[in-house]
UniProtKB/Swiss-Prot annotation:
It holds the Pfam family ATP-synt. It is a peripheral membrane protein. It comes from Salinibacter ruber (strain DSM 13855 / M31). Gene3D superfamilies: 3.40.1380.10, ATP synthase, gamma subunit, helix hairpin domain (1.10.287.80). Keywords: ATP synthesis, Cell inner membrane, Cell membrane, CF(1), Hydrogen ion transport, Ion transport, Membrane, Transport. GO terms for biological process: proton motive force-driven plasma membrane ATP synthesis. CDD domains: F1-ATPase_gamma. GO terms for molecular function: ATP binding; proton-transporting ATP synthase activity, rotational mechanism. Belongs to the ATPase gamma chain family. This is ATP synthase gamma chain. It comes from the Bacteria.
Length: 308
């Protein structure tokens, strides 16, 4: 009977776990719907402001704005990595971290050796990972996703711009997971500073941009700027940077909720399978115990008859 109790305890424990994972799946699904609404609204605006900035950049001299080229004295680099504050979301965090580490190994190995590589980690998981490995961390953006707002994007950009203007780093790259659907997230390495020559497009932006990149006649728009391109550029560039980071934060948040929903759904399904297997094992063990008891009773009855 002790074996039966052990099996019963395991079934009860897994049943409790299943209830938790099912609840977490439902919470993630609700958060995902809200995150999707935000990212679907942000993408067109971020694309258009990028298009306009790129158009202005081509119209003007490369020296028209300090963010169009790296400071001459700058030798360092800043990598902004966006992860989650929590786990239980499959490979979401490890995908972003591995992408950042691959970027460092392939592009910034010498920079890291010279101790000129800096990391700005948005999310507890990435911050903890790179802090343990003694990277030079900039800022503190742990726990921002519970109340994610535009101020976070502005502060990240201000930290990145400050080091860029001071010549501490001459490149800023943004690493994050882009939301495609609940199953698929694209790992993105996006150049932020200096503003790239060609407009950067993620796989999802490439797909969605076909609907609004050009007018119906297929020709690029020739803008007329008022009060003038240089004046407009001073206003537009900060907004461009803010919205690229804001979009990346929203993409990552939506991808996180989608990954967590799928992970918790898989965990719930696995728990149900385990419960079925253990229930079958429990019934077999119980049947064996009953059979043994019946055999003991039968043997005892036969022994009494023989002795009588």
């Amino acid at each position: 009977m002790a074996n039966l109790r052990d099996i019963r305890n395991r079934i009860d424990s897994i049943e409790n776990t299943k209830q938790v994972t099912r609840a977490m799946k439902m919470v993630a699904a609700a958060k995902l719907r809200r995150a999707q609404e935000k990212i679907f609204r942000a993408r067109p605006y971020a694309y258009k402001i990028g298009e306009l900035t790129n158009h202005l950049k081509q119209e003007l001299d490369p020296t028209a704005h300090p963010f169009f080229q790296a400071p001459e004295e700058a030798s360092g680099a800043l990598v902004i990595v966006i992860t989650a504050d929590r786990g239980l979301c499959g490979s979401f965090n490890s995908d972003a971290i591995n992408t950042a580490e691959h970027l460092i190994e392939t592009t910034y190995a010498e920079t890291q050796s010279a101790d000129d590589l800096f990391m700005l980690c948005v999310g507890k998981k990435g911050h903890k990972h790179f802090q343990k490995r003694d990277y030079r961390l900039v800022g503190d953006y742990k726990g921002v996703f519970d109340g994610l707002n535009f101020d976070v994007a502005q502060q990240v950009v201000e930290d990145a711009v400050e080091g860029f203007e001071r010549g501490i780093w001459g490149e800023v790259k943004l690493v994050y997971n882009e939301f495609k659907n609940t199953i698929v997230q694209n790992q993105i390495v996006e150049p932020l500073l200096p503003i790239p020559e060609e407009r950067f497009e993620t796989p999802v932006m490439e797909e969605e941009a076909d609907g609004f990149a050009l007018p119906e006649n297929g020709r690029a728009i020739d803008y007329i700027f008022e009060p003038g391109a240089p004046t407009l550029l001073d206003e537009l560039v900060p907004r461009y940077l803010y919205y690229q980071v804001w979009r990346a934060l929203l993409e990552s948040n939506a991808a996180e909720q989608g990954a967590r929903m799928v992970a918790m759904d898989n965990a719930t399904s696995n728990a149900e399978e385990l419960i079925e297997d253990l229930t079958l094992e429990y019934n077999r063990a119980r049947q064996s115990a009953i059979t043994r008891e019946l055999l003991d009773i039968t043997s005892g009855a036969e022994a009494l008859e023989e002795s009588g």
